[in-house]
A protein has these predicted regions:
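Active-site anion-handling motifs in enzyme catalytic cores
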Residues: 1-380
Length: 380
C-alpha cells in the first residue's frame, strides 16, 4: 500500500517538525511493508527567517546553523527532498489525488485551521481533502486551532460536512476541534487523542553533543524563556529570578538572557528542556517537551487570535488534560505583565515536584492512547 501523511512541516518550529516525524515513525512501525511518506505539500510557504531582533553576529551564525539543521532534518528524517507549495485549493487537491494513496493520515498540528485562507474566502483548505480523493482518510490528532461553527459561511458548512463524512476515523487533538466536528457527526464518532510527540522517545545524545561541542554549561538552577521580541515583561521577570540565583536562558536572541540557544536542531531541542528548572513559553510543543523532560512549564497565550470566543485554546486544553490548570497557564491578555509571571513562576517552583509522578503516568497514558487510536484505525 501507499500511505501519505498530510501535515505541517519544514518551518523553523521544533514542534511542527517533530510532530511530523513522530507521526511518520508511528505509522511506519505499523506499516513495515508499505510505502509511507510525508506528503511533500504546503498550502503556503513555511517561515524560515533568522531572528533579526536583538541579533548579534554570533546569534546570526547560530541561526544559520539552525536553518541548515532544519534542512537536514527535513531531508534525512522526514524523507523530503523537494517541497511543493500550492496555494490554489483545487490544484492542491489535484496534486494529492494524483499521488494515488491508499490511506491518508491527516495530522497532527493545526492544519485544519481556516484563518490562513484569504479574507472573504468561502472555501475550506486543502488539508481537509475532498470526497473526490478516494483514499481511506483518517484524522490523526488534527486541530482546527480556533475555528468555530458559528463563524463558518454556508458554503463552508456544506464543504466541511462532505469532507468530514468522508473520514474513516476522527481523532482530534483538542476540545475546540471536537466541538467543531460535533456539529457534523455524532460525538461518539469523535475521539480526543493526544499529540504524536508523546509517543516519541527522547535521544539525549543529540543535545549532549551540541552542548559539549559548543562548551555550554547550563547550571542546575536555570529558567528558560521562549518568547516574542515584543514581550516587554521578559526583562523584568528575568532580572527578578537572576537576583534569586537562577541562570536565564533564551531560545531566541535576548539582551536580558545569560545563555542564548537559538542554534538547535529539532532533536537537540527535544532534549534540552531537562537542563532547566522551568520554561516560560507561548508554544504548545514546548509545553509537551517540558513535561516529557520532567520540568515545569508556564505557558501563556499571547493574544485572542489563538483562542475561541469561549476562551479555549490548544494550550489551555493541554494544560487542563494534565490537571495543571490554571496555575501553569496565563491565558488572559490583561495578565501578560511581569508581576503575574513572577507570582506564577514562584508558585510553580514551590509545588511542581509533588506532581511529577502523576505527570509521568499521564505522559505514558498519552503515548498509549495515541498509538492505540492508530492501531484501531488499521481495522476500522
Amino acid at each position: 500500500m501507499k500511505i501519505g501523511i498530510l501535515t505541517y512541516y519544514g518551518d523553523l518550529n521544533c514542534g511542527t517538525n517533530l510532530q511530523a516525524y513522530a507521526t511518520l515513525v508511528a505509522v511506519r512501525q505499523r506499516h513495515p511493508q508499505d510505502d509511507v511518506e510525508v506528503i511533500p505539500f504546503h498550502a503556503f510557504r513555511p517561515q524560515r527567517k533568522p531572528y533579526l531582533s536583538n541579533a548579534t553576529l554570533q546569534s546570526l551564525l547560530y541561526d544559520w546553523r539552525r536553518i541548515q539543521q532544519y534542512n537536514r532534518f527535513k531531508k534525512e528524517f522526514l524523507g523530503i527532498t523537494k517541497d511543493n507549495i500550492i496555494a490554489d485549493i483545487k490544484s492542491a487537491l489535484h496534486f494529492i489525488k494524483e499521488r494515488n494513496y491508499d490511506i491518508i493520515y491527516i495530522g497532527a498540528d493545526t492544519l485544519l485551521e481556516l484563518d490562513r485562507l484569504p479574507q472573504g474566502c468561502h472555501d475550506i483548505s486543502a488539508y481537509w481533502l475532498s470526497p473526490d480523493i478516494k483514499a481511506k482518510k483518517v484524522l490523526l490528532a488534527a486541530s482546527c486551532k480556533n475555528t468555530e461553527y458559528d463563524t463558518l459561511s454556508k458554503p463552508q458548512i456544506e464543504k466541511l460536512s462532505a469532507a468530514i463524512k468522508g473520514f474513516s476515523g476522527l481523532g482530534v487533538r483538542d476540545i475546540t476541534t471536537y466541538n467543531l466536528l460535533s456539529h457534523f457527526v455524532d460525538r461518539e464518532q469523535i475521539e480526543m487523542i493526544p499529540d504524536p510527540t508523546f509517543s516519541l522517545p527522547i535521544d539525549y545524545s543529540h543535545i549532549e553533543r551540541y552542548l559539549q561541542k559548543n562548551k555550554i554549561d547550563i547550571p542546575k538552577r536555570s529558567i528558560c524563556f521562549h518568547t516574542y521580541r515584543t514581550d516587554s515583561w521578559c526583562s523584568e521577570v528575568a532580572a527578578h529570578f537572576r537576583e534569586k540565583g537562577f541562570t536565564i536562558v533564551s531560545l531566541r536572541p535576548a539582551p536580558w538572557a545569560d545563555i542564548i540557544l537559538n542554534g538547535l536542531s529539532p532533536l537537540e531541542q527535544l532534549g534540552v528542556y531537562r537542563y532547566f528548572s522551568l520554561i516560560v513559553t507561548h508554544r504548545f510543543h514546548d509545553t509537551i517537551f517540558a513535561l516529557k523532560n520532567g520540568i515545569a512549564p508556564l505557558t501563556y497565550v499571547s493574544d485572542s487570535s489563538y483562542t475561541t470566543t469561549l476562551g479555549n485554546s490548544k494550550c489551555s486544553s493541554l494544560i487542563e488534560d494534565f490537571n495543571l490548570y490554571p496555575q501553569h497557564i496565563i491565558d488572559n491578555p490583561s495578565e501578560l505583565k511581569a508581576r503575574y509571571f513572577i507570582e506564577r513562576i514562584e508558585a510553580i517552583l514551590n509545588s511542581f515536584d509533588s506532581r511529577k509522578e502523576a505527570i509521568e503516568h499521564k505522559i505514558q497514558s498519552c503515548a498509549q492512547a495515541y498509538l492505540g487510536f492508530l492501531d484501531k484505525s488499521l481495522t476500522d
